[in-house]
UniProtKB/Swiss-Prot annotation:
One of its GO terms (biological process) is acetate metabolic process. It catalyses: butanoate + ATP = butanoyl phosphate + ADP. Pfam families: Acetate_kinase (PF00871). SUPFAM superfamilies: Actin-like ATPase domain (SSF53067). Its EC number is 2.7.2.7. This is Probable butyrate kinase. The lineage of its organism: Bacteria, Bacillati, Bacillota, Bacilli, Bacillales. Belongs to the acetokinase family. GO terms for cellular component: cytoplasm. Keywords: ATP-binding, Cytoplasm, Kinase, Nucleotide-binding, Transferase. Its main location: cytoplasm. It is found in: Cytoplasm.
């Protein structure tokens, strides 16, 4: 009889704008992780982000060689997914159609587009599979949830899919259940804040944490009064880019307090800064209110609420949110995020036969 759970060795790749994080995992256990920093001058040699893939791939292979890691022992390479067409969650084989969309920048140019391309190149050379897991374009929203109130605008699913899904599985396991059988609310709280309604393995509703929807966050404005925003847009004082920056980049804590660092805000509060306390409380209030709305989407059948991301390290912040929502359901806290491990887990589920890999299709 074939043993499904023999040890697998997985290379994980997470490209950022000026760095590439890599990890080598034995099943879920990390045996090597490193952030490869890329010199700005080196990157500026390339006209497009996508042209960096050979340079970054070589940097990864050189680093593994220096560490004495035998790449011929890898069972799979798994990368952070890029800006693709909307797809349901899961672990996807990096196929020709995906490479085509990543290289052409179908849904935009972003460093994460390099992940699948590099993974495929390394994996093909070793004759092993390459995957991506739960990219930001995961879209499982119900048709009802996509209605905005204006026929010209449809609500979009853009959220921290990789961490939300990984943490949801972890929470389900801690409760002795399967993610695919649970109804839960996952709240990722980092530079952006997204609250996902997880209904038996699918995120059927979630706020767009990038382009101004939901609670304000350390550097994003979230939902703001629409009429007043229109007035700002047509005041003649701001360009389109400046308005977008107010929504994403200089909004939220940064706009009110001059910093997007939650640790610094907590220090300001401890030092007696009443404005900092007030704004921090307002952010907790908005997060809690959005969680309340998410519970209505599940008709109150909420088996767990999970708080995750960098802000979940803030004990006073978490405590403030709990005070509003602990009547709804049990609140579990998993601070931070581990994208490399989440990628390894996604590949492992397929390698061990717990899940089927999915195929990306251009229709």
């Amino acid at each position: 009889m074939k043993v499904l759970h023999d040890e697998k060795r997985i290379l994980t790749i997470n490209p950022g704008s000026t760095s590439t994080k890599i990890g080598v995992f034995h099943n879920e256990r990390s045996i090597f992780e490193k952030t490869l920093r890329h010199n700005i001058e080196e990157l500026q040699r390339f006209d497009r982000i996508i042209d960096q893939y050979e340079f970054r791939k070589n940097h990864i292979l050189e680093t593994l060689h220096e560490q004495g890691i035998n790449i011929s022992k890898f069972d799979a390479v798994c990368a952070r997914g890029g800006l693709l067409r909307p797809i349901e969650g899961g672990t996807y084989v990096v196929n020709d159609e995906m490479i085509e969309d990543l290289k052409s920048g179908y849904a935009g140019q972003h460093a994460s587009n390099l992940g699948g391309i590099i993974a495929r190149e390394i994996a093909d050379g070793l004759n092993i599979p390459s995957y991506i897991v739960d990219p930001v374009v995961v879209d499982e929203m119900s048709v009802l949830a996509k209605v905005s109130g204006m026929p010209e605008i449809e609500r979009k699913s853009i959220f921290h899919a990789l961490n939300q899904k990984a943490v949801a599985r972890k929470a389900a396991a801690s409760l002795g259940k399967r993610y695919e059988n649970m109804k839960m609310i996952i709240t990722h709280m980092g530079g952006g804040i997204t609250i996902g309604v997880h209904d038996r393995g699918r995120v059927v509703d979630v706020n767009n944490g990038l382009h101004g929807e939901g609670p304000f966050s350390p550097e994003r404005a979230g939902t703001v009064p629409a009429g007043d925003l229109v007035d700002l847009c047509f005041s003649g004082e701001y360009t389109k880019e400046e308005i977008m920056k107010k929504l994403v980049g200089t909004g939220g804590l940064l706009g009110y307090l001059g910093t997007n660092d939650a640790v610094k805000v907590e220090q300001m509060i401890q030092g007696g800064d009443e404005k900092a306390r007030f704004i921090y409380d307002a952010m907790a209030y908005q997060v809690a209110k959005e969680i309340g709305a998410a519970s209505a989407a599940l008709k109150g059948e909420v088996e767990a609420i999970v708080l995750t991301g960098g802000l979940a390290y803030g004990k006073s912040f978490v405590s403030a949110i709990r005070s509003y929502i602990d009547w709804i359901s049990d609140v579990l806290v998993y601070p931070g995020e581990n994208e490399l491990q989440s990628l390894a887990q996604g590949a492992l589920r397929v390698l061990q036969g717990e899940e089927q890999s999915k195929q990306y299709r251009i229709e």
